[in-house]
From Swiss-Prot:
This is Protein DML1. It comes from the Eukaryota. The keyword Mitochondrion applies. Belongs to the misato family. GO terms for cellular component: mitochondrion. Pfam families: Misat_Tub_SegII (PF10644), Tubulin_3 (PF14881). InterPro entries: DML1/Misato, DML1/Misato_tubulin, Misato_II_tubulin-like, Tubulin/FtsZ_GTPase_sf. It comes from Kluyveromyces lactis (strain ATCC 8585 / CBS 2359 / DSM 70799 / NBRC 1267 / NRRL Y-1140 / WM37). It is found in: Mitochondrion. Disulfide bonds: none annotated. Keywords: Mitochondrion. Involved in the partitioning of the mitochondrial organelle and mitochondrial DNA (mtDNA) inheritance.
Length: 468
């Protein structure tokens, strides 16, 4: 067994993980599939059945789990609506403390709980929370919550706010980094992470999914640093959400204080996470769409990449080495461990899922960008697999995926020259605008050194000033 644990950090990331596990759910009926890579099997010897819970650790702010109680499917007393319907002494003697307005289950989740054969169609109104349409039941050890920060359902795109007062937000890299180190590190490693690790026979690695533009980037950076210190021999693939910023939109850097802060967060988080990860995937976060819809599109890429590690038992003996996270890392980096930003993220004819494709060319960059390495993930034609060509099982669609993204035949991921445009642009920006930051020179050095990893051929030394 080669288990992979998904560590999902932020509300947006939890939507992506929900979509991913919803797409895995149909595979549970296929005995040939190695479902225990991403799912933990629980065997009932009496009924001779097996149930699965996701190998996942989900981080969210308070209220981010919506109507879902941590022990809801373990103990009914964890869910307020159950108390309402109960009769007898338990309901009469129960003492309830209400700290916020109750979040009701969505019609979709109610239909799932009732075993309905026909489920309501997903839309923006009934899928505000990832728990509104989650098909699998999580183990209580999967849930982790920021105790002093609250999710605001009315402003989904905003970072969590302190004590639900909507005055101070979780929108700073340093705030997130300090929060994990000072308040959550010991408990997380000793409790929930430890419980998930105990359920693995031969862990091969972690997927880290996080946002980069706010405090979650710093939070994840500190977490990954300690994870690598604790488990240095496993693989780490990080998927970082990037919202459009002043660079991608070609706006003045100081157009607003908030936009400048977002860019500072993104730069620091990208440096920290890419340095500690085996592979780093810069995802585009579309803030104009509801979370369920945008992540329902992005899951085509995420599911395709991870389908490489989750396959047929019949083929396991013949291509087991090629279905490891470490093999994909080697195929994309070819031993150049510092050149690990996977900037080409394409699925079929859909728009690119890479944020870096939205960034303008740097002053003297060439177009198109050179491709250092590229891997194809084939989900239809089933050609023979090779080091750079992976044949996996067909895409299994879920009814929670938008109608516009119901098919997935081939994904192409690669390491290109494009990160140089991004890193050099950021290096110029840091030189000009990080005037009083204590880590200014360190960030400049990191960006300059890292950009060299993505250079190919010769460049014109006559660089005109960047108009930011």
């Amino acid at each position: 067994m080669r288990e992979i644990i998904n560590v999902s950090v932020s509300h947006r990331s939890n939507h992506l993980i929900t979509q991913f596990y919803n797409c895995l759910e149909p595979l549970l009926h296929d005995a040939d599939q190695e479902n225990d890579v991403f799912l933990n099997p629980n065997i009932d010897k009496v009924s001779k059945t097996v149930s699965y819970t996701p190998r996942a650790l989900l981080w969210d702010a308070k209220l981010g789990n919506g109507s879902l109680g941590t022990y809801q499917y373990v103990s009914e007393n964890d869910y307020a609506d159950t108390l309402d319907s109960e009769q007898g002494a338990t309901a009469k003697t129960a003492h309830r403390v209400q700290t916020h307005d109750r979040i009701r289950k969505s019609p979709y989740q109610l239909a799932l709980d009732q075993g309905a054969t026909v489920l309501p169609k997903i839309n923006d109104e009934i899928a505000k929370y990832w728990s509104d349409y989650s098909k699998l039941i999580y183990d209580p050890s999967s849930f982790n919550t920021l105790q002093d920060w609250y999710h605001d359902a009315a402003n989904q795109q905003k970072a969590p706010n302190f004590q639900n007062l909507r005055q101070v937000y979780f929108d700073n890299y340093e705030t997130g980094s300090n929060q994990f180190r000072e308040n959550y590190s010991n408990e997380f490693f000793d409790s929930n992470l430890h419980q998930q690790l105990e359920k693995c026979d031969s862990l091969q690695g972690f997927n880290i999914i996080t946002e980069l533009d706010n405090g979650w980037g710093g939070f994840s950076s500190s977490m990954l640093l300690e994870l690598k210190d604790e488990l240095p021999k496993v693989s780490y693939h990080t998927y970082g959400w990037n919202q459009d910023d002043v660079c991608s939109l070609k706006e003045p850097v100081h157009s607003t204080k908030t936009k400048f802060q977002m860019l500072c967060n993104k730069i620091r988080a990208t440096i920290a996470l890419s340095q500690e990860s085996d592979l780093f995937f810069p995802l585009y976060a579309n803030t104009k769409e509801a979370f369920w819809r945008s992540t329902g599109e992005t899951v085509l890429l995420f599911d395709s990449v991870n389908s490489v590690f989750h396959g047929s038992r019949k083929q396991a003996a013949t291509n087991s080495n090629m279905r490891k996270m470490s093999h994909l890392t080697n195929a994309l980096t070819l031993g150049e461990s510092k050149r690990n930003i996977v900037s080409k993220l394409n699925v079929d004819e859909y728009n690119s899922f890479s944020f870096y494709d939205r960034m303008p060319l740097y002053k003297n960059s060439k177009k198109p960008s050179h491709t250092f390495t590229q891997c194809e993930i084939d989900r239809v034609n089933h050609k023979e697999s090779s080091m750079f060509h992976f044949t996996t099982y067909p895409w299994t669609n879920s009814d929670t995926i938008p109608d516009t993204h119901h098919s997935c035949a081939e994904s192409v991921i690669g390491v290109t020259e494009k990160p140089r445009d991004v890193l050099k642009t950021w290096e110029d920006l840091v030189s000009r605008y990080f005037r009083y930051d204590s880590d200014r020179e360190e960030i400049k050095d990191h960006l300059g050194t890292l950009s060299l990893e993505y250079e190919h051929g010769w460049y014109d030394d006559d660089d005109s000033d960047l108009d930011l």
